[in-house]
Amino acid sequence: KKKKNVSFLKKLQDNELLPETQQSEYYRTHPITRNRISALTTRLAQSGVKPVQPNLHWKDQHNRMKAKLLGFLSPQQVSWTYDDHDNTIPAVMAYAVAAYQNSDEKKAVRKVEALVGLEPDNPYYHELAGQIYADFGRLEESRAAYAKAHKLRPKDGLIAIAYAHILIVNDQSGASDLKEAIKLLRGAIASEPRSTRLYRLLATAYGKLKNDPMAKLYLAEEAYLKRNAPETGRLASLAIRGLAENSQEWHRAKDLIFYAEQHKAAKKR
């Protein structure tokens, strides 16, 4: 605390260099002298209190977070904040994201590949690469990047959803890829149970596999999350006709139908 007080007093002392009209009101009513700063510094030294060293890992993570946010929210400021030849992780990340935001495919790809090269075992850099590749239409490269991210972080639901999305929308994907996407998405339900995108993708994958009852069931799940009771009931009623009786999916469809009926009855009261 005392160290912070010394720092505060030194900042206020800078007011001495300013014209009186530009000095802070606090400084004009609380004049700071070199003696007061010296006295406080001496007391701090005699107290035996050691300054707390910053956690370098947290500081590094904070710098990375700031760089990523800067790239997404203020891409035009990146070149003012980081030198273009700065090869630190925050700088490379900021330039990769800024180029992506500015639709500069060549630079975005070059920078994100450099970022992955700096930390090849970081799943989130492979995830970012997958996102950049996908949005520039490079789906095979996106697929490889997301596959690597998922391998490094298999329990991350958001990575699994993004990977499944690429498997589903890629025209090169076959039935085995669609089944892999379904496996990924079903595995992600535990960590992302409120994701409407997850259920929409499941419906799309089952639809591509010509499994209409399951596609309808997951569309009903999506409608349920959106609090659309009539649509939930309609889709679940269509789904249950083709589901094996007493199967887990059949019982879930029954639950969704019951929810829709209860909602309808409540509105009539």
How does the language model describe each region?
Residues K208, L217-L219, A223-R269:
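Terminal, low-structured helical/coil segments at or just beyond the last alpha-helical repeat
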Residues K1-K155, K183, N228, A265-R269:
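Extracytoplasmic and endomembrane cell-envelope/extracellular-matrix remodeling and assembly machinery
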Residues V97, Q131, H165, V169-Q172, ...:
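Residue-level recognition of tetratricopeptide repeat
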